[in-house]
C-alpha cells in the first residue's frame, strides 16, 4: 500500500539531531509552561541575553540558567570532495558526557517541536539537514536562534524552555 504525499501529509526536509546528557527520563521533562514558570521563579536577577556567551555549565540548579547560558558550538569540518564529515568527539567538543543521541525528521509543515524544558538534562541541537529556528525562554527573556549548518550546535542547559519551529521545506 503506497501512500502519496499530499498537502495533508507533507513533511519538511529538516533533520534535527539531539545530543543529550541524560538517558530518557519522563520525570526530567517539564512539559507544562506554567509548571516551568513556577520552577524557575527565584530572586535571581536575569541579565539581558547574549547567545554568543559560552555556557557556564550550571549543572545543579536549572532555575539559575538563563538564555545567556545557551551557546553555539562549532564542530570541526573535514572537507572532502566526496562529502564533508563533521566528527563529534565526546568531551572534545561537547561540554557534558553523552548519554543519548536521537534525531527528529519528517516533521509536518508548520509543526512545532520541543515545547518543554529539562530539570537536569543538557541538550545540543544540530540542524543535520535543512534549517529551523529555536525559541529559547528562561521565564524572563526570550531569544530565537536560527540553526542552518550541520557544523554548528546549540547547547541548551537545564531550565530553559525550548521550542523548535519553522522547519525548512523541500
Regions found by a protein language model. Name each.
Residues 1-3, 150-160:
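Conserved SET/PR-domain catalytic core that frames the SAM/AdoMet-binding pocket
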Residues 8, 12-15, 24-154, 169-170:
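Non-catalytic, conserved peripheral segments adjacent to functional cores
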Residues 3-4, 22-25, 161:
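Short acidic/polar capping segments at secondary-structure boundaries
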Amino acid at each position: 500500500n503506497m501512500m502519496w504525499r499530499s498537502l495533508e501529509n507533507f513533511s519538511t526536509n529538516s533533520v534535527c539531531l539531539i545530543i543529550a546528557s541524560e538517558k530518557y527520563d519522563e520525570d526530567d521533562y517539564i512539559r507544562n509552561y506554567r509548571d516551568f514558570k513556577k520552577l524557575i521563579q527565584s530572586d535571581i536577577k536575569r541579565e539581558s541575553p547574549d547567545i554568543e556567551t559560552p555556557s557556564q555549565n550550571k549543572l545543579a540548579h536549572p532555575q539559575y540558567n538563563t538564555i545567556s547560558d545557551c551557546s553555539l558550538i562549532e564542530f570541526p569540518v573535514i572537507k572532502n570532495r566526496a562529502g564533508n564529515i563533521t566528527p563529534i568527539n565526546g568531551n572534545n567538543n561537547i561540554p557534558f558526557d553523552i548519554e543519548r543521541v536521537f534525531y527528529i525528521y519528517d516533521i509536518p509543515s508548520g509543526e512545532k517541536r520541543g515545547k518543554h524544558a529539562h530539570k537536569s538534562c543538557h541538550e545540543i541541537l544540530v540542524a543535520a539537514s535543512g534549517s529551523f529556528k529555536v525559541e529559547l525562554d528562561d521565564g524572563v527573556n526570550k531569544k530565537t536562534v536560527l540553526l542552518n549548518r550541520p557544523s554548528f550546535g546549540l547547547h541548551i542547559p537545564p531550565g530553559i524552555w525550548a521550542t523548535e519551529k519553522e522547519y525548512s521545506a523541500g
